[in-house]
Amino acid sequence: MTTLLEQRSSANLWHRFGNWITSTENRMYVGWFGVLLIPTALTAAIVFILAFIAAPPVDVDGIREPVSGSLLYGNNIITATVVPTSAAIGLHLYPIWEAASLDEWLYNGGPYQMIVLHFLIAIYAYMGRQWELSYRLGMRPWIPVAFSAPVAAATAVLLIYPIGQGSFSDGMMLGISGTFNFMIVFSPEHNILMHPFHMIGVAGVFGGALFSAMHGSLVTSTLVRETSEVESANTGYKFGQEEETYNIVAAHGYFGRLIFQYASFNNSRSLHFFLAAWPVIGIWFAALGISTMSFNLNGFNFNNSILDHQGRTIDTWADLLNRANLGIEVMHERNAHNFPLDLASGEVQPIALTAPAIAS
């Protein structure tokens, strides 16, 4: 009898917990995906903040030349970054318990892998939570579909690219200048400017920004006039009011006369579908482009220059791009001349299991 009551009590407790988790009456919806989202997002955020501020230098190239990335080791808010996991680790999972000591884990860039993997799980869970809440409210699932674009982009640069290149050390650094460094280096190594998927991605991002600005300005400008012709159209309106003032007929007429008749939408749903689909599809293609270039299926490379009748080169944009790519790649390969001494010498060199002391 006691066992039966305990089982019924625990089942009732679980039922109440499930009802609270999935309740749409809460101030903030948690959901079953939220149970996964909260711990992973908190872990990624806390480790990122600690590493950004105080992580010691990381041997990112695997040749015992540590790179400083944190604020306390000489960087400012622009140059500070979480340095990727060392090339010596490659694609191996590198949790704290796999290292001989905490110093070794930090020296090999363990925080980067910890942040990235928890962050990716968190954004997948956030997308699932969007679907879950939409389902509970009886809505259609287009919000998580739209959010899948930035999720795909983050997955491409933080996971697919390191897998394709064979090491987490090739992943995007987690900082402002680190992000720009990743972009600049990506160009010469994969000729991204000549990749059609990147071109579609650029059109999606910039086109989406343009269409968003056009739509916002039209909505703000087209008022349902409630004044006479001798009064200002702005009379009686205030910024942020609840009452709708947008007149799609006026917007359609204005835009149709500004460009041409069929350039404007006369249906609000088709307009907003277009505004959502354009940037989402563009970012999908950008993520797909990064993923294909991860495995070195690179952009077009026109190596054969155009020659005139005397055999002299007629420079094209492709030639200029190739020269720029070579220059950037040479600048980036800071250790190309420096063969690791432990491989060059005949004697076996001892392997340091603890981070070396950094002179202040």
From Swiss-Prot:
The record marks Y161 as: Tyrosine radical intermediate. The chain crosses the membrane at residues 29-46, 118-133, 142-156, 197-218, 274-288. InterPro entries: D1/D2, Photo_II_D1/D2_sf, Photo_RC_L/M, Photo_RC_L/M_CS, PSII_D1. The keyword Calcium applies. Cyanobacteria usually contain more than 2 copies of the psbA gene. Belongs to the reaction center PufL/M/PsbA/D family. Photosystem II (PSII) is a light-driven water:plastoquinone oxidoreductase that uses light energy to abstract electrons from H(2)O, generating O(2) and a proton gradient subsequently used for ATP formation. It consists of a core antenna complex that captures photons, and an electron transfer chain that converts photonic excitation into a charge separation. The D1/D2 (PsbA/PsbD) reaction center heterodimer binds P680, the primary electron donor of PSII as well as several subsequent electron acceptors. This is Photosystem II protein D1 3. The gene is psbA5.
